[in-house]
Amino acid sequence: MTIDRTYPIFTVRWLAVHGLAVPTVFFLGAISAMQFIQR
């Protein structure tokens, strides 16, 4: 039953990485777009 114990950890880690990476990329894209529009 080691697979059942490591699976949730991998899922939580995957969700945490994507949950932080997606908004960060979107936020950086919005900032770069704002600065590009201001110029």
Swiss-Prot record:
GO terms for molecular function: electron transfer activity; heme binding; iron ion binding. PROSITE patterns: CYTOCHROME_B559 (PS00537). It is a single-pass membrane protein. Keywords: Chloroplast, Electron transport, Heme, Iron, Membrane, Metal-binding, Photosynthesis, Photosystem II, Plastid, Thylakoid, Transmembrane, Transmembrane helix, Transport. It holds the Pfam family Cytochrom_B559. One of its GO terms (cellular component) is chloroplast thylakoid membrane. With its partner (PsbE) binds heme. PSII binds additional chlorophylls, carotenoids and specific lipids. Heme binds at residue 18. It is found in: Plastid, Chloroplast thylakoid membrane. GO terms for biological process: photosynthetic electron transport chain. Its cofactor is heme b. The chain crosses the membrane at residues 14-30. Belongs to the PsbE/PsbF family. This b-type cytochrome is tightly associated with the reaction center of photosystem II (PSII). PSII is a light-driven water:plastoquinone oxidoreductase that uses light energy to abstract electrons from H(2)O, generating O(2) and a proton gradient subsequently used for ATP formation. It consists of a core antenna complex that captures photons, and an electron transfer chain that converts photonic excitation into a charge separation. HAMAP family: PSII_PsbF. Heterodimer of an alpha subunit and a beta subunit. PSII is composed of 1 copy each of membrane proteins PsbA, PsbB, PsbC, PsbD, PsbE, PsbF, PsbH, PsbI, PsbJ, PsbK, PsbL, PsbM, PsbT, PsbX, PsbY, PsbZ, Psb30/Ycf12, at least 3 peripheral proteins of the oxygen-evolving complex and a large number of cofactors. It forms dimeric complexes. This is Cytochrome b559 subunit beta.
